[in-house]
Amino acid sequence: VPNKLDMNNIFCRAPFMHLYVGYDGRCRLCCVSKPNEKTKTLSAVDSSNFWDYWSGEYLTEVRNDMLNNVPRKECEPCYTIEDTGGKSFRNAFDIRHSHIDLQGKELFFPNDLDIRFSKLCNLKCRMCSESISSQLEKEIANNYSVLKQYRDQITQPVMSENNFKKILGNINSIDYIKVAGGEPSIMPEVESFLQAFIDNNRHTGDNAVNLLITTNCTNQNTKFEKLINQFSNVTLTVSFEGIGLVNNYIRSPSNFDILEQTLISYLKKHKCILNATIQAYNLPYLIEFVNWLKYINENFGQLDAFFMLLDQPGELACYNLSKSLRNYYVDMYLENIDFDATWLADSNLKSSLELLKKDQSEISNYRFVHRTKAFDHVRNQHIKDYLPEVFEDIQETYTTMAMPS
């Protein structure tokens, strides 16, 4: 019997072995897939809905489409990346689990989990939402007249205690755990979750789980670090969008100098990967960012990077900048950045820039400016003091736009 899993370029292993639970408790195929109205929410008290999702109609349909080379709308982000020559999450899943021959069947219990336990966070990043950041939720509530259109509060818990127990009851079936937030290093649920793996002897030795944690590097939580230092297979995905004032503006209220020192400390103990979005706020400053990456790699240890074009919220995507500004910087980067450098080889930076170059769309900057000025207003900031090249591009709209008191 031929192995159908190798017969097409649509197939992805994620629906057969991976479980993603988002900030709202809703499952998706993976963290980059588009949502589908048929997906289930795992925040109900009854844990039976876990099996409703994993063995249910929706995932059965997706798996059959994968095996029959039928594209899925949810998977368009990966198709787009691959069409431009980039490395997609689909590629990553195939490489990570290539040793497992599924023979067209899902695993009894997913061996690869991606869980967001809560929205507890200590940052209020410009591109984030209050469903992901508790700090942003507070800021919007305290400045509702100015920020009300950026409200998308989700009050339900991400996961019920029963579903949490269901996962821990299958702890020996799990090979990969990814934890994101919010900020995992300050979440008590994450501490309990990691301790369960230690108590079950899944943290080290031949049976050690692969632990992947996304962190903003803002603080070195002693208790959290003691926990992750007990795991033998740890990868930290560190979130940066730029250096210096660019970082401080986008990822408020962080201080880049502190982030850098925390990152250097992590590099001494763990494998780290830098994750960054390319967006309207940081496009003019990528060359400085790349030069800093070179500096870190040459002086403190290997830090591979992964870039993705920001598409949500749409008002912060690169297409909100003028076409002339975009083309100026994209052309300069394509000509001057050494994309063959080890830390950029699989970064998707070149393919992302080529996609920007190919798509000459230009939209009104009104929504971009409104979001920018609204948060500037409540934070007592001005974009010109942080991102002068971006301000110059939007100056006319920004200067004339009124803000509610």
Roles of regions detected by a PLM:
Residues V1-S48, R116, E137, N229-Q230, ...:
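Radical SAM enzyme [4Fe-4S]-AdoMet core and its adjacent flexible, acidic
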Residues L5, K34-T80:
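Membrane-interface junctions of multi-pass transporters
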Residues M17-Y20, E57-N68, F109-R116:
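Short, intrinsically disordered, charge-biased short linear motifs at domain edges
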Residues R28-V32, P71-D83, L120-E130:
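Local cysteine-cluster metal-coordination motifs and their immediate loop/turn environment
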Residues P77, D83-D112, C121-L123:
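Recognition helices and adjacent regulatory flanks at domain boundaries
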Residues P110-L120, S131-M159, N172-P188, N200-T222, ...:
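Core AdoMet radical
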Residues L147-N162, D175-I177, F193-D199, T204, ...:
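Eukaryote-biased activation of long, low-complexity terminal tails and linkers
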Residues N163-N170, A196-T204, L227-N229, Y266:
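Leucine-rich repeat
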